[in-house]
Amino acid sequence: MPSANPWPSEIRLNPARDVLTVAFDDGARFELRAELLRVESPSAEVRNHGGPKTIVLGKQDVKIAGLEPVGNYAVRISFDDGHDTGLYSWAYLHQLGAEKDRIWAAYLQATSRAAAHK
């Protein structure tokens, strides 16, 4: 179960810019692929302004272009496809890491359904 108030103790981007490692003060450590971070962006455009979530396709080769701290609660992750509006709170990154297998499986299922409807 994710910590109620996780605090990052380390944030590191690998040299290939496709994996973000985040360690937390509760001992959790997650390696988050750029593609997962991009398709699960907490931005309004991906979250569809409160409506059904937008399925983001074609991001297999996306890279992380930059990281920018936002106050004491989040990081803005910019991607090489130009997307830079998601603010990833520490709690969201912790949740994404803790549930990444389930989240990724749901994403793959959604992309399969989207492809079947074309």
Where are these regions (language model features)?
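Motif-centric detector for short Cys/His coordination patterns
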Residues: M1-K118
